[in-house]
């Protein structure tokens, strides 16, 4: 009976360790996805902030050549 208890505790312990590792990997993956989304948003903001400069440059060229 004692051998069975020890085996059961060992299986439960290893299962908990495995579950903990999986949860940690899942959290890391979610953080990486979140960071990637933030990078995409910041790139979009940088591009959108350039649009007024591009428009004014095109307008000045149109006035100069037009």
Curated annotation (Swiss-Prot):
Keywords associated with the record: Amidation, Amphibian defense peptide, Cleavage on pair of basic residues, Immunity, Innate immunity, Membrane, Secreted, Signal, Target cell membrane, Target membrane
InterPro entries named in the record: Frog_antimicrobial_propeptide (IPR004275), FSAP (IPR016322)
Tissue specificity annotation: Expressed by the skin glands.
An annotated GO cellular component: membrane
One example of a Gene Ontology biological process annotation: innate immune response
Region annotated Disordered, chain positions: 25-44
Protein name: Phylloseptin-S3
Organism, as annotated: Phyllomedusa sauvagei (Sauvage's leaf frog)
Source species taxonomy: Eukaryota, Metazoa, Chordata, Craniata, Vertebrata
């Amino acid at each position: 009976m004692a051998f069975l208890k020890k085996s059961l505790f060992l299986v439960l312990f290893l299962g908990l360790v495995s579950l903990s590792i999986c949860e940690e990997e899942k959290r890391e993956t979610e953080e990486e996805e979140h960071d990637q989304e933030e990078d995409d948003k910041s790139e979009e903001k940088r591009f959108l902030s350039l649009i007024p400069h591009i428009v004014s440059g095109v307008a000045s060229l149109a006035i100069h050549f037009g």
